[in-house]
């Protein structure tokens, strides 16, 4: 039978793995029996998806990432190179905890930067942004921007990955997309789009790189 997804010759796909249409699996990957991967995903070199792990649609997993049992990744997530998940908070070689893996939920649209570590048992809210090298030990709110070791909230990011600058009315505008955001209590929401659906086609291609926007902000100051 013709596969509906693409697999490199060096990748290993166990019988019983579920993989969606148009997903691309590159060199030296291993998708275990019982793993679920959605459609239109990309798995870079040396990615492992374990039994019981779930990956949604349009997820980009960069090189050297292991998605362990107990991890659920929703749609439109970006997992940067060599980022790390765990599924036991107190591992010991002599103590088996395979039946009590702790759950980690990565909500729609999240970005996890290169070499970041996500400690198990937490939820990364929709469109949260984890900076490269951060160590995240607690839940992140929707659109939250987390940096450092241990990870700390350093603001909020738009769906296009730009830091939101809120005015006195707790409103902010993404400098790239012009989408409006509102900060109410401890949560941020987009005023112009349904947050549970993909970006419309006219907003799904970047127009300028992040550094150019950053320079404009500094010039305005």
Per-region residue spans from a language model:
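Loop-to-transmembrane alpha-helix entry segments
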Residues: 138-139
